Amino acid sequence: MRKICLIFSSVLLFSSCSDTIDEGYMIDNPEIELAIPSYFPELNSSFNLNKPTKFGVELGEKFFNDKCFSINNSISCSSCHQQKNAFADNEKQAIGVYNRIGLRNTPPIQNLAFLKFYNWDGSKLRLENQPLVPIITHEEMNSSIVEVIAKIENDSEYKSLLKKVFGDEKLTAERIYKSIAQYEYSLISANSKYDKVKTGQASFTANEQAGFQIFQKKCSSCHNGELFTDESFRNIGFPINLDSNEAGRARVTGEMKDYMSFRVPSLRNVEYTAPYGSFGQFPNLKSVLDYLDNGVINSDNLDPIFKNNGNRIPLTEQEKNRLLDFMKTLSDPTFIGK
């Protein structure tokens, strides 16, 4: 696997601050090459239209960490998406401005360049369309993109980076969204023990190997592929938050067949992203496995994997322990900064 490096190809962009072209102005803003294993899925089409560049990623990261995106300048994207938690957090539900409680558990940000859906309900199909959601949501940043631009458009550091990325200093909503997406596209996690085993650089312990075999038999119908998600939307009978108007995927489709269905989460770095469930119903992974074993909530649209098996996934205590051993091999300490 190659380390992240720069493709030293110059991109010519011209200054257009006053609608004139400075033909002597050249910007070296090379695309960055990401350390993507050959066995990973294909990059999505949005990535290919907005490939991360040296300064695009730097600009996106600056936006990502800027508290001016919230109405009272108290939180940034990184307030909820913390690197130490695989860019999730340890809260049951996201905490927004004025300590408002969000609808759902904060999703991790990793390997987004390969996904087809974003948000737990799949409401966004392009990553570039996602950043506006937390900006305008009452329980999150409760601001507007117009207000954000007004706050930061005269910042000298932003002006410098905008010129390096786009050729002029003009700040627009589209440029904000594209830059944040470039930064998030660059967050590739592929350096776990599992990856080292996959590439012949390490071996599973006996317990990890046993856990992998149990996982293949009892978990991989949903958590499959190298991202350990099939990106489907399923109702798996988790406890329902009676204090919210949650409907899962049905909020997007308006169809009862999607009621309380959520996107199957990737299990990469799952060790770091507790609590679990759409609103943090489970404090740890063991409690998730116990719940699946004891039996989930039945409903008309309960996923057939449960519906056809007594509404549960039977697991012995030994199987649960081995599964926990295996899932820890999906942890990438370098990704979370350890």
Model-derived features with residue positions:
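Periplasmic c-type cytochrome electron-transfer domains
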Residues: 17-338
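Bacterial Sec-dependent N-terminal signal peptides
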Residues: 1-24
